[in-house]
Design a protein with these regions (language model features):
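Aromatic-anchored, charged helix-turn/loop surface patch used as a conserved interaction hotspot
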Residues: 1-111, 156-174
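Intrinsically disordered, low-complexity proline-rich tandem-repeat tracts
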Residues: 173-176, 181-186, 192, 200-202
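C-terminal non-catalytic interaction appendages of large macromolecular assemblies
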Residues: 96-172, 206
Length: 206
């Protein structure tokens, strides 16, 4: 799903003061470099322009920037308490069996021990089994290969969250883009996701 026309939510984001825009974007992605680049590039004529800017900023994140971004994401199966965003994105694990949750915990720990960071995947639309299979597959990657997969997955997450940010701002004025607070930024399966032909993990995003 893409949008080639401007919206009220996008207009409100474009009009935010710099500090408020950075706060809103921090709820989308914890990388300061990513948020700063998107903030200074405003105004965006269309939502597609915003998504393209996000893709470009994500592509240029350094290893340190990626680490900062990943630090804002909880492990799969352990969403942040009181955070509806991570809970909604990881709802595929909510009804998983105790055995699957335990296996995912063990795989997460093994992955983190090898790579030094959480296992990051665009969880929207995935079942618990699909996420488990993905970490099983990716744990055998080299650090360099895994870093680029993480970059792709982060880009997908950012697009979904940005889509929800601007569309929720249009549907519910005053909630996600309230100046000085950063919102709450809620996510679901309705945001636009870039296609990644040949990606080692196939997505089922709406």
């Amino acid at each position: 799903v893409t949008s080639s026309t401007t919206s009220g939510g996008l207009d409100r984001f474009n009009a935010l003061q710099e500090r408020a825009a950075l706060a809103v974007l921090h709820e989308v992605c914890a990388s300061r470099a990513w948020a700063e680049r998107l903030t200074v590039a405003r105004p965006y004529p269309t939502a597609d322009d915003l998504y393209a800017a996000s893709d470009a900023a994500t592509a240029e994140l350094t290893t340190a920037d990626l680490a900062e971004a990943m630090a804002g994401h909880p492990p799969i199966g352990r969403p942040k308490p009181g955070d509806p965003t991570s809970s909604r994105e990881q709802r595929g694990m909510a009804d998983a069996s105790a055995e699957l949750k335990e296996e995912m915990l063990e795989l997460n720990l093994a992955y983190q021990e090898k790579f030094g960071h959480v296992f990051l995947i665009c969880a929207t639309g995935r079942t618990g089994e699909q996420m488990r299979d993905a970490v099983r597959e990716r744990i055998g990657n080299s650090p360099e290969r895994e870093r680029e997969i993480v970059r792709v997955e982060l880009g997908k997450i950012n697009r979904i969250r940005l889509g929800n940010l601007v569309h929720l701002a249009e549907d519910e004025p005053g909630a996600p883009l309230q100046e000085g607070t950063g919102g709450p930024v809620r996510t679901g399966s309705g945001g636009p996701v870039p296609e990644e032909p040949g990606s080692p993990v196939q997505e089922e995003e709406a």
